[in-house]
Amino acid sequence: MKTAIFTVVLALAVFAVLSFGWEANEKALSEEFTELIHEKEAASEAEARECRYFWGECHDHMPCCDWLVCRYKWPITYNICVWNRTFPEK
């Protein structure tokens, strides 16, 4: 009887250790995935700030892309980037 109880307790201890290991691994993967997503967001934000695209709001600190020009268009109450009738060179 003592051997059976000892075996059950030992099995529960092994399962607890394995469960803790899987949980730690899952948490590490989750943190790594979250970090990767934040890196991708930061890269896309930096890319988006280089210039404003067609119909994007523009100011002195937010310039339009090379083939666009910043203009005031009524009834919109702010400046937008519109096409300057040129084509970007590739």
Curated annotation (Swiss-Prot):
Subcellular location, record wording: Secreted
Tissues expressing this chain: Expressed by the venom gland.
Gene Ontology terms for molecular function: ion channel inhibitor activity; toxin activity
Main location: secreted
Keywords: Disulfide bond, Ion channel impairing toxin, Knottin, Secreted, Signal, Toxin
InterPro entries recorded: Huwentoxin-1 (IPR011696)
Propeptide: 20-50
Disulfide bonds listed in the record: 51-65, 58-70, 64-81
GO CC terms in record: extracellular region
Transmembrane segments: none
Extent of the signal sequence: 1-19
Pfam families membership: Toxin_12
Domain comment (free text): The presence of a 'disulfide through disulfide knot' structurally defines this protein as a knottin.
Function as written in the Swiss-Prot or TrEMBL entry: Ion channel inhibitor.
Family the entry assigns: Belongs to the neurotoxin 10 (Hwtx-1) family. 13 (Hntx-13) subfamily.
Protein name: U7-theraphotoxin-Hhn1a 6
